[in-house]
Amino acid sequence: MSGTDIAFFLLALAAIAGGVTMLQLTNVVHMVIALVMTFLGIAGLYVLLSAEFVAVVQVLIYSGAITIIMLFAIMLTRHHADDKERQTTGGVWHRAVAAISVLAFGLAVYFGIRRLDFGADGSALAADNAREIGKWLYSYYTIPFEIVSVILLVALIGAIVLAKKDGKGAEDK
Amino acid sequence: MSFLSLLVFSPLLGIILLAFVRRTDTKTIQWLGTAATVPPLLLALFAFIRSGSGFRLEQLDESYDWVRLANLPFFTDAAYVIRYELGIDGLSLLFIVLTAVLGTLAAVASLLIKVEKKGYFMWLLALEIGMLGVFAAANFIWFFLFLEVTLVAMFLLVGKWGGFERERAAYGYLLYNGLGSALLLVVIAVLVARTGTANFALLHETLHNPVAEGQLIAPLTAEARYWLLGGLLLAFAVKLPAVPLHRWLVRVHVEAPPPVVMLHAGVLLKIATYGMIRFGIGLFPDEFRAFAGAIAVLGVINILYGALLALRQRELKHVLAYSSVSHMGVVLVGLGALNEAGIQGAVFQSVAHGLIAALSFLLVGVLANRIGTTDIHRLGGLAKAMPIFSGYLLTAALALLGLPGLAGFVGELTAFLGLFETKPALAAAGALGLIFAAVYSLRAILDITFGHTRERYESTLGLRGAKESAASVSEPRVIDLQAKEAVPAFVLVALIVAVGVYPQLLAEPLATVLETMMNGLGG
Amino acid sequence: MMNLAWVVPLFPLCSFALLLLFGRKWKKASAYVGIVATLLSLLAALGVLAGRLGGTTYEANWTWMQIGDVTLTAGFSVTALNAWMLVVVAFVSWLVHIYSQGYMAGDERFSTFYAYLGLFTFAMLGLVLSPNLLQAYIFWELVGLGSFLLIGFYFYKEEAKAAAKKAFIMTRIGDVGFFIGMLLLFWQTKSFDYDDIFRAVGDGTLSPGMTTLTAILIFIGAIGKSGQFPLHTWLPDAMEGPTPVSALIHAATMVAAGVYLVAALFPLYEASEAAMMTVAVIGGVTAIFAATIGLVQTDIKRVLAYSTISQLGYMMLALGSGSYVAAIFHLTTHAFFKALLFLAAGSVIHAVHTQNIEEMGGLWRRLPWTAPLFLVGALSISGVPLFAGFFSKDEILAAAWLNGSVELFWLAVAAALLTSFYMFRLFFLVFTGEARHDGDAHEAPMSMVGPMVVLGVLSVASGYIQTPWFGSFLGEWLTDGAYHHEAAPGWIAVVATIVSLVGILLAWLMYGKRTVPRDWLSARAPHGYELLRRHYYVDDFYRWTVVALVSFISRLLAYVDRYLVEGIVRLVTGTVSAAASAGSRGQNGQAQTYGAVTVAGLAILVVIFALTGGYWL
Amino acid sequence: MNDVWQANWSMMTPEWIVLAAAIVLLLIDLVMPKERSRRPLAWGAAAGAVLALIATAAMIPADPVSILHDTFRLDGFAKAFKLILLAGGALALLLVAEWEPKEGSHYRGEFAYMMLFALLGAMMTASSGDLLTLFVSIELLTVSSYVLAGLRKTATASNEAALKYVINGGIATAIMLFGMSYVFGLTGTTNLGDIARELQETNEPYMLALAFLLLLIGVSFKLATVPFHMWAPDVYEGAPVPATAFFSVVSKTAGFVLLLRLFVTIFAAAPAEGRDPSSLLLSMQPVITVLAGLTMIIGNVVALRQRSLKRLLAYSSIAHAGYLLAGFAAMSWAMIDSLWIYLLAYVFMNIGAFAIVAHIVNETGSDDLAGLAGLYRHRPLLAAALGLFLLSLAGIPGTAGFIAKFYLFIGLVVTEPGHYVLATVMAVTTVVSYVYYFNLLVQLFFRPASLAPLRRLPAGLSTAVVLCALGTLAIGWVPDLAYDVLAQFGHFGDFLP
Amino acid sequence: MTLSAYLALALILFCIGLYGALTKRNTVIVLICIELMLNAVNINFVAFAKYGAHPGVHGHVFALFAIAIAAAEAAVGLAALIAFYRNRKTVQVDEANSLKH
């Protein structure tokens, strides 16, 4: 067992543990924090997979940005939040159906991936993959890149439109 | 515009003109609505008379490019070209004349409609366009198109201008016939998809020509043909209607306004006959043989079932509804015989029942209008107050029970003549229906017109009489059939007698069609 | 003249049409239209008869309807039989038209009555002229229509309504037999023409079984129309119609149509032993059966009606015994004397306004014309020698004897005894003794008496066209000379005479002289008496069997229709609507439920795929 | 880098127009004084869409073009479906122009350009030959749609709709992306053509099939077909009517575009373990067939119980998605043609119906179907138009709906063996749909009129109604108008890269 | 380390996210679970970029796009949630049930 393997197991364990903990916790803030562990674990895995740039982005965006805005959202909406409140929806049936379906789905997929192997070792991935990614983005994937910029614009405007409290003056009009 | 298009679409002019008439101007509406049914009548009669003097109906065929469904390189130019095609032969001509005649008479009888007359006439004319189109169409798509026009028009006519349970009846009509049409559409789609044409003649040729078989776009196996024919027959069995798919008919007969029932019982049910002959026997003669026995049995069941149920009804409209079921059974009997006599009988019976049912419902309309009820148990002795009306009613009953010399007999005779050749025992069982027909029609009509004047409605009569002259309460007076009602009734009786006395009138146009059909059946 | 035979039925048809259109305007004058039309018919019929005397036949056909290669024709033919029938029918009809002028005077639907009479006469003449079965069937039914309309003439009476309906339906039952037989015959012989059918019978195209079957089926039609057992029950009820109608239709013409039909198809029947036997047995049974019922009836017209049934049974017996001539002979004489009896009965009813013989009596003096004429009729029907009935009945008895059916012969003899008994019971109760009714009874006007006188003469004279003494004119005429009178044993005539006289004597003892108490039978055999009075419970039997069965089935089907057929429809629509509401309830507004459904769907698809290894369906 | 500059960007004119219009409108909205009405923005957006439509039409004769390794493709397919998308978008924007926000909210200029952005996403979906571009494009549409659904900010229903849309959309996106990741992993490329070629040699049919199912479920969210249909009624009901019209037409069209692009290109020639080893798509046909059948049944049956017009049309749109999916499941030569015709007809009949519903909602403040009662009395023409749309939706001949549905039927039965069961299900459920469509007709024509007559239709709605009615009638009576356009695309012979 | 290990991990995380998204009551958590699902997918992409059929950095690009879109979705989702919260004063997803049937 090599060092990478050990690292993989630790990181995977962290990621899964974060997820499972999240499912078990009752406090919303704790849940988010638990997921940060997962996100960080995933970032570590990206490093193992020679995707340093993605790992950095992962840390910045998920462990950072998204977690923060989620926490903000929780704070913003946390007027009567009560930790003792029920944290899961629906009845037993709903959860059972969800669990069984998810489990069945997972098993079936696992059956497919358990020995999936293309024999590639991925050594060809350049160490400076940020540059490589840049090249791809600005040549091959120019168009989707532009579209994503539009999406972000839309998300920006949309978030403002939806979240902004309409001023009194506007409502009077 | 060509002759047939003119014939089919001429009521459209009426619809357009009606749109500009004020809603309250009922006189103009009635006048215009009736007048709009005259052009098709004249044109149809013209064609009928011309065809009698050796005019070849094929000359009337029309065909224009309409739509090209697929333009793929691996299809021939003709494939999937759906054309606007009209064309008639003797068979369609008979039904067109029937439609045109009943259309005008129903428009005249619509005097009794009091509410929303404008919309009523617009839809009535639309219904007539649909019915004429169904018989004039020379291709499946247009046949279906016109068929659905009748579906929508009938739904609205029944649902808006019908009796107390009109909407239920309208929905019943819609669902049963919609299902029939849907099934028909699937069959049409299969035929069009696999042959690349919707034209009757081309389809006929393609389906029967072994050389063309190879040119089908996708194969039509022998088994598939049975399924297709089964689908067709089932679709038309709903429209006929065959027991046990008849419940909608009963409701429509009872709830729809009588002039609409004139057209419904008179023409719409006959689309089933037409369809079964034209498509069933016309396109799948060999396969039809396999179904013939079942059809004949179903026909006999229809006859007896309808007749036995008609025996028990206390509502005249119900009696007539079940009698329609019974009479349409004769059509099935004729088709099940699958010989010339049988097919001819099916057509005759359709025309005859069309006329008779129209007469019956014309009179039912008058009865409902005058007395306010058509409940047999509440009526009686009407012949005293309304002798002329009662005379017509009696004639209708006699026609219903198939009295020789009237149209109904000719249909029953020919149909049974056909079945006696192929399945005598079954035919004999069906002939028992003749007895029941006598029982139910006489029971219903005699209970209304003969016997004592019932107390229950005497007051109605008295009341009505009292309005006119307060002194004559003791002698109830109801207005007898008036001239504007008597004229359509008389025309119908005259036609019923004409067909009954000289059926060759109908047989002549049919002769060539039958011959072709019998060739298809292999002698 | 014979090529114009088609005009014979045309006159009454014109009368019908004219009266229907203008009758209300013409009122009284309507009678003359009818009388003139039938007179013209009669004259034309006589012309045809005269032409036929020349010995030629005539047939003409037109296309009625084409079915593929088959052409159904309509036309007329003149044979000895129908030329003779034309005259009989037209003649009786004419007399009844005249008689009705008096009888129906004052009825507000006077013209309608004449219109109906015209329709009936047209149909009857048309039936007689038909050269083929189909046309015969058409007129056969039209005759039924005429009868129906006339029975129901007093439409406001519930009894008339019921009687009319019953008459139509009972005869319809027979007609369906006719219909089936006719159509079967058509496919066997490819024709409806009598001649073609006879040819097929002759050359064996028609198998013996089919011959018997079709003959019996057609005979069912005759049973219905001629009021034979077991379809006779309508005929007594039909007496609800006006009396001239009873005379014309239910005595002289229509009811004889059954006999005529069998006679017209005689070669078909002759070819089948079984069919002949059936006809004979039905005829014989009906003769005695109806006669016994006639013994106890109290309605004057009903007695006559049962007597008609009985006499028609005689005719059938004659046909079944192979004596076609005897049947037609009896048909003719019966037409005259029974018409006479009915008209006379009508005259009595006209005078006393009741039909119950218990309320009559002592009318001999009050009705100086009617009473003797009735007596003539009664003597004739009773078979008293020298009256027409004697000869024709004798001929039938002889035929039955010669045919070897001894049982039927004695049955007929017994029926003859009963006939003379109940006829004279009637006579004595109505015309002798003290008057049991109040009010004045006046003799009828001349328009009524006149036809009765003519019929009275014929009730005697018509017997002499076929007698053992002067020669068998009728027989030779009907068979184109081939007829030869088979010598019947002389004792038959003697027995017949004795029997009829005994019957009269008994009636006199019981009702005239009253030495035998009237309740002799009812006292001694109350059950038997009741049995007869209730017409052997045939009507009740039908009510409790056939009617009940049909009613049961139709009630059953009504339930099937309402609950099973509609139930299935309801089930389907109910299922759809339940599915709709379930689906709608499943849409519970929970976003996560929607997701869960999706994931469950995904899982199902994936698992099925994983388990089946991709082999779907 | 050179590729970027040498590419034939003029082929993206319609997209540029839409994007430019959106940006310009956005800027105008920003600088416009607060008190000015934003309605003209919607007219401007509609004009932009029409302009783009004209530009697309002008490019019909052009040869197929591929920019940057198929990340943008302008083939017949793209042009054909862009026509529908733009027509639907333009018509929906006409509805936006007459939108009357209720419950104290005010008209929002964002509505117009958000819809343009969504339209842009849809158009890009039609034009992409690359997995990544497809994903990003459809996400542009989806994210914009979330915003559109929530635009009635003060209405709880609208908030709820947006929320449900986001949650279900997120799950769908994740599932689809999961599927895409396997497709990507098995092939190592995002170009659809390359993927197809790679897949022909793959020896992982099981994983491929799993990817197929994941993608199918993901896409079924956009199509609103079983099993991912349940969000649609809630979102359709809660969203503003013009947005609902947009979702039911443009989003659905985009979904089918995605379906065709992805599945036909990638899976048609991929190996499978199923009944047809040569084609995964064909061996998965039964799955699609079952889903299509279920969609038709559920959509039509549940619609029977709806009283809300928007909800009813939502279920009806599920049902129509079922019909379309059935057309796809048939996989006949008529597949793309018949879907195109159907979607075209659907644009006209559905937006027409929504335009009138929008008016009813504007006027009465409620979308209960009783609001239609007696419309015929006061506004006979409007009632007649709605009647026409409903008949067309029901597939009655003489309308576009029939022609379209008939072509679907042809597709279903022309294959060997034919999909007779599916055709029958389609026929029968169509009859079920008669009940609720005719129930609206009953309201229109039979019921007594309500007291207050509706105002006249405002300009935007009346334009939309007239155009839709014309379209519905034209395709119904002169179908060659549509078929001739279709023929221009050469039956999509250049569809596969 | 083999490909399948990464894929299995991704699958587990995807399933956890999916289960959480279907059962958690707090909308924020539901949204974050969706993020987790997308993250799991990204592991797939990155793993395939290294061990897939044609290893290459375009797998990373796909993952980056996915992250961007996930962020956009999260933003809009939270905005929608805040709008909802403003009107209903709750963030529990099962209380968003006024639209149904």
Swiss-Prot record, chain E:
Keywords: Cell membrane, Membrane, NAD, Quinone, Translocase, Transmembrane, Transmembrane helix, Transport. Its EC number is 7.1.1.-. The keyword 4Fe-4S does not apply. It catalyses: a quinone + NADH + 5 H(+)(in) = a quinol + NAD(+) + 4 H(+)(out). Pfam families: Oxidored_q2 (PF00420). The keyword Cell division does not apply. The chain crosses the membrane at residues 2-22, 28-48, 62-82. GO terms for cellular component: NADH dehydrogenase complex; plasma membrane. GO terms for biological process: ATP synthesis coupled electron transport. GO terms for molecular function: NADH:ubiquinone reductase (non-electrogenic) activity; quinone binding. It is a multi-pass membrane protein. It is found in: Cell membrane. It is an enzyme of class 7 (translocase). Belongs to the complex I subunit 4L family. NDH-1 is composed of 14 different subunits. Subunits NuoA, H, J, K, L, M, N constitute the membrane sector of the complex. NDH-1 shuttles electrons from NADH, via FMN and iron-sulfur (Fe-S) centers, to quinones in the respiratory chain. The immediate electron acceptor for the enzyme in this species is believed to be a menaquinone. Couples the redox reaction to proton translocation (for every two electrons transferred, four hydrogen ions are translocated across the cytoplasmic membrane), and thus conserves the redox energy in a proton gradient. This is NADH-quinone oxidoreductase subunit K. The gene is nuoK.
